[in-house]
Each structure stands twice: as structure tokens, then as C-alpha cells.
């Protein structure tokens, strides 16, 4: 293959993806501005062509798209609570930034853009398990802006012929997961708190349930979606989850026995659980990592 771009390629999911696709492309270009406060470090791969740039910076990122075959768009203002604190920044990065990436790809005749979205777009009103035909129920700036990105992808496919595939990830965890601050993903927070001798902080009563998906399975979905001969997922949204879920209290007990309960937070669903039939059918994708097995080995 020729070239690929990974936005957010020095972060958690992006850096794992970069490591996987390096053998598949003549050149992998990484765009990242190191803006995530939750990342303990950033993972720039020295085998890539690396650019510390903002995805909204059209003038500087546009030349990077020439002769690129596939764009993996992961850069975002991520996680719910930080976007509630700063909705303007989340709108700029997740909407304007995504539109900028799509426009650059369109102008450079990129063959396909693979977009990372979120299961939080399903909100509270939809019944479990969640499937892609259900209506959006966005409860916070994060879900609103990421789902808007999905709509932009669909529009660029329908109006301009740019092939796009959008993924709704369900609570990704694994190697290089963010651990800093109170708004990092919960598994990373719990491991950090336990290792530092603190009590693990469980929001609310801990009975909220989440479908946790290992980062390697997310990476596999991205690689499968980049196979250009497969047109079936183009213009579609696909769930990437496991089809099983665990309560936050269960997760805490798997990691340690020192925990406490803190006040509930606004804008978060009580339960997530993915129906992954579409990803299985269109990509041949199935999750391979069980949360309990990973925690036993890594926590």
C-alpha cells in the first residue's frame, strides 16, 4: 500500500493502531497536538513521519494528504466530563477538526477515511443491547460533537463520493490507556489509584454497567475497515464492543478491595451494551480479549 495518516496517532488508541499498520504502508504519517491532559505520556513512533499539529490547522495539514490512501481519524477532544467543562473547545476540535480532515481527504483524493466515534451517542432512551439503527440521544457535548462527526462523514460519502466508515467504540481499555486526572477512563484511574495506595473512587453506587472493549480489538476493526475492496461498510456506522458488560463496582473488585463512593455525575448513561452484528457481518470482526483475562494479567 502507499501512505496512511493517523490523526491522534501519539495517543492511546492511535499509537496502538500505528504500531499495527506500520508494516502495511510505505509511509505512516502521524498528526497529533498532544492536547490530552489524561495521557501520562505520548507515544510517537520514530518509524513514522510525525507532525505536532492541530487538526483544525488546514493550511499546515493539507499538504500531508497528498498520495495518501487511507486516513484513520482518531484525534478528538475526548471524554464526557471535560467537554461539559469546555463545550466550545469540544465543538471546535470534534466538529471543525473532523470537517477539516474530511475536506483535506476529499481534495487529495484519499480513498477512505475511518472515523472514531462513541457509544455515548445512544444516550439513555434506547433499550439494551444498542444497535446502529437506534436514534441518537446525545446527553453531553462529547456525544453531540462526535455524532455530528458521523453525520459529516455520511455527507462526504453521499455528496462527494469520499468513502467513510464510522465506528462507535464502547469503553476502550488496554495498553497505554490514559491514567491521569479524575476524567481518565475508569480502568486506568482504578489501577493508578490502587498502585498509589489511594482508594478507588466509584461514581454513584457503582451499579452502572459498561461494555469494555480492548484496544487491540479496536485496532483490528480499523485495519479490517481499511480493506478498500470491501465496500459494504462505506457510509455506515458500526458498533465496536464485546456484547457483554460489567458494573463499575465489579471492575473495582477485580482490581482491588480499597474503594469508596463519590457523587454521581451529569450526562452519563446508566448502561451500555453493544450489538455487534453489523461489524461481524460487514467486516468479519469479532472481539478476542476478555476483560477478566486482561485484568488478571495486567492489574
Predicted regions and their residues:
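N-terminal Rossmann-like NAD(P)+-binding domain of SDR-like oxidoreductases, especially those catalyzing
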Residues: 1-170, 285
